[in-house]
UniProtKB/Swiss-Prot annotation:
It comes from Zygosaccharomyces bailii. Residues 61-86, 217-249 are annotated as: Disordered. Residues 240-249 have a biased composition (Basic residues). Residues 67-77 have a biased composition (Low complexity). Keywords: Plasmid, Plasmid partition. The keyword Metal-binding does not apply. The lineage of its organism: Eukaryota, Fungi, Dikarya, Ascomycota, Saccharomycotina. Coiled coil: none annotated. GO terms for biological process: plasmid partitioning. Plasmid partition require REP1, REP2, and a cis-acting DNA sequence (known as STB). This is Trans-acting factor C. It comes from the Eukaryota. The gene is C.
Length: 249
């Protein structure tokens, strides 16, 4: 394969991007491909697919993207670490668009009456929700609320079909996740999502659902009913804010 590569990518959260780089570092370190990715890869750009000048494509093995599916194990480089169970929107490979299969499913298209703009809108919305979901999932891994986070994630039905009920189910679960993290962290995650290109209407929809309209100078959330919610920072929230700021600068 030619040494010149180009990258195509979708939006992912910064922690996920760093995790991917670490796995590439441990498995493909020293290879020409890794060197190029290391020089090109930026925080927030993920779901990598590498395309050579000859239009040959080299997909990053799904196991390196976080999938724990047994079907992916044969494609993994030696020494690939075993990953903990992850929700589908963490491990799903969105590098070619989230709905490659669903677009060819007649029932899915009929659900939206074949309207292309509606399909595109749902693509953006689910991709945006997935990005926020990944950010929250990564952010809460070491927090006391992780058991509750896992319970919520286990209730998510994979919306692989292009249906509004599936999208709404995903949105409801993301809202529940965001309510588990400190207000300051919640706003930082939403701000990062906006910077990642998620449609502003999706962000505003979620922000209104979490009943937060602003954050005052003391870091307290101001709810829509104008009652202030006090929040005593915990060590978890301090560490989390520091980590998010470091990854998104």
């Amino acid at each position: 394969m030619n040494s010149e590569f180009s990258l195509a990518y979708g939006n992912v959260d910064s922690d996920y991007a760093l995790d991917l780089l670490e796995r590439l570092d441990s498995n493909w370190k020293g290879t020409e491909l890794f060197t190029h990715i290391r020089e090109t890869f930026q925080i927030g750009l993920g779901n990598v697919i590498i395309v050579s000048e000859q239009s040959e494509s080299l997909r990053i093995p799904p196991s390196l993207l976080g999938s724990s599916s047994p079907a992916d194990s044969d494609n993994s480089p030696p020494g690939t670490p075993t990953n903990e169970a992850q929700p589908w929107f963490i491990s799903e490979d969105l590098s070619k668009g989230p709905f490659t299969e669903a677009q060819s499913t007649q029932s899915s298209i009929e659900t939206l009456e074949g309207e292309h703009h509606a399909v595109s809108s749902l693509h953006l919305k689910l991709n945006g929700l997935s990005c926020i979901g990944r950010a929250v999932w990564r952010a809460t891994r070491k927090m006391d609320t992780r058991t509750e986070v896992d319970d919520i994630l286990n209730s998510i039905t994979e919306p692989r079909r292009l249906t509004l009920p599936g999208i709404n189910k995903m949105r409801q679960c993301i809202v529940r996740l965001l309510l588990l993290v400190p207000i300051q962290v919640r706003e930082e995650i939403l701000s990062f999502a906006i910077a990642s290109g998620i449609p502003s209407e999706t962000i505003e929809d979620i922000r209104s659902s979490t009943n937060i309209s602003a954050v005052d100078t003391n870091g307290r959330g101001i709810a829509h009913n104008s009652k202030k919610r006090s929040l005593a920072p915990t060590q978890d929230s301090r560490n989390l804010r520091r980590r998010i700021r470091g990854h998104t600068q």
